[in-house]
């Protein structure tokens, strides 16, 4: 599925703005999609609906279906064109109708879907567009939610007390997310109506090599001839070819590298009959060799942030202003990488990372797969087929982005209590990712703090990615003990002869809280936490990167472990740097992107 663009052959109409909105229930088809929604209120699209009306808690705590509606008119000059309705994402399950006719259904809240509406939307006609989205999470969704009677992530309980058990049975149905970020829902990314000629370009794949050869494949409908031209960054034609697939050689090729290098971008300009499409790409290689990660043949060190799509008012909704702000802060911090924890981000963010030279670890929404020793998720959770779907959709969507250098299959599953079942679940996904990716990027699985000696899955990934909270959730506040424990574990990973990086580590920090002795939750402790652990990373030649948790404070489900969300951000939620950020900014300024541990 190509990203929609407007050019001489294609028209793109934004349907973003203020829509009509109504909360539903757990009844799937509660409202008639052919009629106006009853008692509708205004809602902004794209955005989460949860925080748009503080006069009521109903939106914030909603459980079930929510309904959107607006009218759509196709201009008369679109006559004779194919017409497609496209959603960047709807969380988590979506149904879409035009004039009451069901045209699309999609499960998964972080990847796009579309419907050909040529036969239903005639030029000059106005129709009623209705969208329903279901925010419920459970053992069959990604991310995973807990079922009735279970707790939300970091929830508390006094199991066995009669009054508590009775209250749980009497409680209203609600989401119990098994993940540590707020379960925002709604139409989160742009909605567009776009046109193409009747015979059109359906898909484009680009596989560049650092010697300047570029393999390409163009999927089309119909039999019109295909012509491709490579344009350099100034728009000059530097190579061309005929046919739906082949190899082009770019003379004196410029390579794509993260900043402070040059993230050089080319454009593959494609014509097919009356249709035209431009696909940007960068020429770079990425591979694992021994205990090194090589980008363009040079040993790479990741200096990165884990992030969330999370901000006040619009929740997880797409915000180009915030994306630009965050990318500039990433540059200011002297970082070079982002992990899309814990789901694929908006497509436009990857375009920005391509342009701005930021490396991306691209992650599926597979978070929360595990419930302790009492529950085997690999036998009891019906997830495998949906997991394959979201992995395939992510790779197909993001395959041409030079910024994407690593696929993450998921975050912190249970890998120790049922080790063989875990391996049997995750290893086929590892193989599938390699099969699906035409550029054959490295693949990883981000593992949580566990008994790593029992985990037989993480060690089989191309890069070992470990989330560890030595000094915070365990050995709390004792950084001497934390460093000792970390080194005990790092000795184990040294024996695996793989590149290893810290994919998540951090300390909750209340902005403005200062203590003389670097006590937990203070800004001074955040500095001490990173200073001590980072010094241990630097001693290991096979340690290839660090992704701090988190870029900014963010909202979570309420519970006794969270006060107004997760405070591990190096920036506050409104993007003010904490003391720890100033420390890391100086550290990262002294670490080169290439050759740090040659």
Predicted segments, located by residue:
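The substrate-binding groove and active-site-proximal loops of carbohydrate-active enzymes
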Residues: 109, 176, 180, 308-321, ...
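Feature marks short, surface-exposed loop/turn motifs that line or immediately flank catalytic pockets
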Residues: 91, 135-137, 287, 308-309, ...
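Catalytic metal-binding/acid-base residues of hydrolase active sites
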Residues: 134-136, 343, 365, 410-414, ...
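Proline-centered loop/turn at the N-terminus of a beta-strand
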Residues: 357-359, 365, 440-442, 499
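Short hydrophobic/aromatic-enriched beta-strand-loop microsegments
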Residues: 106, 357-364, 462-468
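Short low-complexity, flexible loop/linker segments enriched in glycine and/or proline
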Residues: 145-146, 352-356, 375-380, 384-387, ...
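Secreted/periplasmic carbohydrate-active enzymes, especially glycoside hydrolases
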Residues: 1-347, 352, 356-360, 390, ...
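Substrate-binding clefts and catalytic carboxylate motifs of secreted carbohydrate-active enzymes
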Residues: 7-31, 171-172, 179-186, 193, ...
């Amino acid at each position: 599925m190509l990203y929609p663009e407007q050019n001489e052959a294609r028209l793109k109409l934004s349907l973003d703005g203020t829509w009509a909105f109504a909360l539903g229930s757990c009844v799937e088809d509660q409202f008639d999609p052919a009629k106006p929604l009853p008692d509708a209120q205004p809602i902004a699209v794209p955005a989460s609906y949860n925080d748009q009306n503080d006069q009521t808690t109903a939106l914030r705590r909603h459980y079930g279906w929510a309904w959107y509606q607006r009218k759509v008119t196709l201009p008369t000059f679109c006559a004779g064109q194919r017409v497609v309705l496209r959603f960047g994402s709807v969380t988590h399950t979506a149904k879409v109708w035009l004039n009451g006719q069901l045209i699309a259904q999609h499960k998964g809240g972080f990847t796009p879907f579309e419907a050909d509406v040529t036969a239903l939307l005639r030029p000059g006609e106005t129709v009623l567009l209705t969208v329903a989205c279901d925010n419920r999470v459970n053992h069959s969704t990604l991310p995973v939610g807990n079922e009735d009677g279970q707790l939300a992530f970091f929830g508390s309980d006094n199991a066995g007390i009669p009054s508590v058990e009775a209250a749980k049975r009497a409680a209203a149905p609600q989401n119990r997310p098994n993940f540590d970020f707020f379960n925002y829902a709604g139409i989160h990314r742009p909605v567009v109506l776009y046109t193409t000629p009747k015979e059109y370009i359906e898909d484009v794949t680009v596989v560049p090599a650092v010697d300047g050869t570029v393999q390409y494949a163009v999927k089309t409908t119909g039999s019109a001839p295909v012509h491709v031209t490579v344009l350099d960054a100034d728009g000059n034609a530097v190579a061309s070819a005929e046919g739906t697939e082949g190899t082009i050689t770019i003379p004196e090729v410029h390579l794509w590298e993260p900043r402070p290098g040059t993230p050089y971008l080319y454009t593959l300009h494609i014509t097919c009959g009356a249709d035209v499409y431009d696909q940007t790409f960068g020429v770079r290689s990425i591979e694992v060799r021994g205990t090194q990660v090589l980008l363009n043949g040079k040993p790479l060190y990741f200096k990165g942030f884990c992030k969330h799509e999370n901000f006040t008012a619009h929740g997880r909704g797409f915000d180009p202003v915030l994306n630009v702000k965050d990318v500039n802060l990433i540059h200011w911090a002297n970082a070079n990488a982002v992990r899309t924890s814990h789901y694929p981000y908006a497509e436009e963010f990857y375009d920005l990372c391509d342009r701005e030279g930021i490396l991306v670890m691209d992650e599926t929404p597979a978070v929360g797969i595990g419930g302790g020793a009492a529950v085997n998720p690999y036998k009891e959770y019906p997830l495998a087929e949906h997991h394959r779907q979201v992995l395939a959709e992510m790779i197909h969507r993001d395959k041409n982005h030079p910024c994407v250098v690593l696929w993450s299959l998921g975050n912190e599953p249970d890998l120790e209590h049922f080790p063989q079942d875990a391996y049997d679940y995750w290893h086929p996904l590892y193989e599938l990712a390699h099969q699906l990716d035409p550029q054959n990027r490295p693949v990883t699985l981000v593992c949580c703090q566990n008994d790593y000696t029992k985990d037989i899955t993480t060690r089989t990934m191309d890069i070992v990615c470990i989330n560890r909270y030595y000094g915070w959730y365990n050995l709390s506040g004792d950084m001497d003990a934390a460093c000792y424990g970390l080194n005990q574990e790092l000795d184990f990973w040294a024996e695996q002869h793989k590149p290893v990086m810290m994919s998540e580590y951090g300390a909750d920090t209340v902005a403005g809280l200062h203590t003389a002795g670097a006590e937990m939750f203070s800004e001074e402790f955040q500095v001490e936490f990173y200073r001590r652990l980072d010094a241990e990373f630097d001693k290991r030649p096979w340690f290839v990167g660090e992704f701090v948790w988190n870029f900014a404070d963010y909202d979570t489900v309420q519970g006794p472990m969270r006060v107004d969300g997760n405070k591990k951000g190096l920036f506050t939620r409104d993007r003010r740097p904490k003391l720890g950020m100033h420390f890391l900014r100086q550290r990262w300024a002294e670490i080169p992107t290439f050759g740090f541990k040659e």
